[in-house]
Amino acid sequence: MDLATLRAQQIELASNVVREDRLNVDPPTIIGGADVGFEQGGEVTRAAMVLLKYPSLELLEYQVARIPTTMPYIPGFLSFREYPALLTAWEMLSRKPDLLFVDGHGISHPRRLGVASHFGMLVDVPTIGVAKKRLCGKFEPLSDEPGAVSPLMDKGEQLAWVWRSKARCNPLFVSTGHRVSIDTALGWVQRCTKGYRLPEPTRWADAVASGRPAFLRWQEIQG
């Protein structure tokens, strides 16, 4: 694995990330969510994608792709490991979302190319990174109140908003993926959060991928 080549690719791709709002449909009518996990000791990569209707946020469609993992886990290069399965799930969708939430980082990455940015550029769709852990940068401690927010800064540059979506829960790191500004990204994540820590698009993607009770109940209702 030639990390120098991958690092150079990241820097080149990151220079082409669009950090301004360029949504084709605004406001979006279909919002997607994506979540990636690994099975069989990391041998299989699993990507789940969901489509939600906006503004109702009802689940319209889901797809789950499982493919052999092609790259080992290397910190800072996770997007290269995850995007093949995401691309497979993306191609399985009957229609494409106007905006995609990705469980992971966008530009809040040491080389400004997390999976939300990498995948957004691959398929040229507006994406938002919604991460549960900090990868780089610093931020001022948040109050315990829901809605508390602080900028994530690195080398004088704001990379994300750190936002506490729910009381007594760790905050989320919301960043530009591609074709969505950092402030617009936070606004959409706030609008799509309904009482849980995660916004509905990535919450549903996780529920589908993991077979959580909310998804099983949805399947029962659908018959």
From Swiss-Prot:
Cross-referenced CDD domains: Endonuclease_V
InterPro entries named in the record: Endonuclease-V (IPR007581)
Compartment(s) of residence: Cytoplasm
Statement: the UniProt record of this protein carries the keyword tRNA processing: no
Family stated for the protein in its record: Belongs to the endonuclease V family.
Official protein name in the record: Endonuclease V
Enzyme Commission designation: 3.1.21.7
Superkingdom of origin organism: Bacteria
The protein's role, per its UniProt record: DNA repair enzyme involved in the repair of deaminated bases. Selectively cleaves double-stranded DNA at the second phosphodiester bond 3' to a deoxyinosine leaving behind the intact lesion on the nicked DNA.
CC cofactor: Mg(2+)
Reaction catalyzed: Endonucleolytic cleavage at apurinic or apyrimidinic sites to products with a 5'-phosphate
Residues annotated as site: Interaction with target DNA: Y73
Entry binding sites for Mg(2+): D35, D103
Principal localisation: cytoplasm
GO MF annotation list: deoxyribonuclease V activity; magnesium ion binding; RNA endonuclease activity, producing 5'-phosphomonoesters; single-stranded RNA binding
GO cellular component, one term: cytoplasm
